[in-house]
């Protein structure tokens, strides 16, 4: 499994010759912006495209794949921007992302999230309102825009299981994570607010595996 962030593509804009991999993309509504993708040799049970927030799910920042043993979450966290112009949005995102991951860990799916699931023939299930001429693809074989996918319903559950998250978190948690922490203190990615939210994520029971292996 490998994950990409900031793909900046829309559905159908790229054709990759990776026959051994299934591919799952999340797209931003704004063209040429943001986006995430996951490529896997193992077929997932289902794939979520978003956190379950109409406000936060317009930029294609989440692809979450459920496997029998764990959830794999690819994330591209919003940048707080110069002078922390987007810090409020960032704080909302960090809280929603933490709740999303804890929910998956506990077996609770967010509602109203576009989801890829295969039917008995292995083809992606389409939303009832999807256009009649929408092409059907095997799971992971096509670029499925979220507009043609069904959405999860509030209260849906899955099996509780570990969550593995990776991607661009847009934060340097501690001074050891930056070459020159002093001049960057308070800047986007190294503000007290963002560092604090990452601490809260770890306090919720998750582990920074890179730092655990390289203290």
What are these model-predicted stretches?
Residues 5, 26, 212:
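Conserved residues at the C-terminal ends of beta-strands
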Residues 1-7:
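Proline-aspartate-enriched helix->loop->beta-strand connector
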Residues 87-97:
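Charged helix-capping and loop-helix junction motifs
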Residues 8, 13-89:
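Structured beta-strand-rich core segments of catalytic domains in phosphoester-bond hydrolases
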Residues 5, 76, 166:
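A cross-family glycoside hydrolase active-site/sugar-binding cleft signature
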Residues 22, 96, 101-131, 135-139, ...:
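Metal-dependent phosphoesterases centered on the DNase I-like endonuclease/exonuclease/phosphatase
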Residues 2, 39, 72, 168, ...:
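A residue-level signal for conserved active-site and pocket-lining positions in enzyme catalytic cores
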């Amino acid at each position: 499994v490998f994950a990409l962030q900031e793909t900046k593509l829309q559905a159908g804009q790229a054709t990759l010759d990776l026959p051994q991999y299934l591919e799952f993309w999340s797209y931003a509504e704004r063209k040429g912006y943001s986006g995430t993708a996951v490529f896997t040799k193992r077929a997932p049970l289902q794939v979520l495209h978003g956190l379950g927030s109409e406000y936060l799910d317009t930029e294609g920042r989440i692809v979450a794949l459920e496997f029998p043993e764990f959830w794999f979450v690819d994330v591209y966290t919003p940048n707080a921007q110069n002078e922390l112009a987007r810090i409020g949005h960032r704080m909302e995102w960090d809280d929603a992302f933490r709740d999303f991951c804890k929910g998956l860990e506990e077996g609770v799916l967010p509602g109203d999230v576009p989801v890829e699931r295969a039917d008995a023939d292995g083809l992606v299930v389409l939303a009832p309102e999807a256009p009649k001429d929408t092409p059907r693809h095997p799971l992971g074989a096509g670029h499925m825009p979220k507009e043609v996918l069904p959405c999860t319903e509030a209260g849906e559950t899955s099996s509780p299981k570990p969550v593995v998250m990776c991607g661009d978190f847009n934060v340097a948690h501690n001074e050891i994570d930056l070459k020159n922490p002093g001049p960057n203190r308070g800047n986007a990615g190294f503000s007290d607010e963002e560092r604090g939210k990452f601490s809260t994520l770890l306090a919720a029971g998750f582990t920074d595996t890179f730092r655990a292996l390289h203290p």
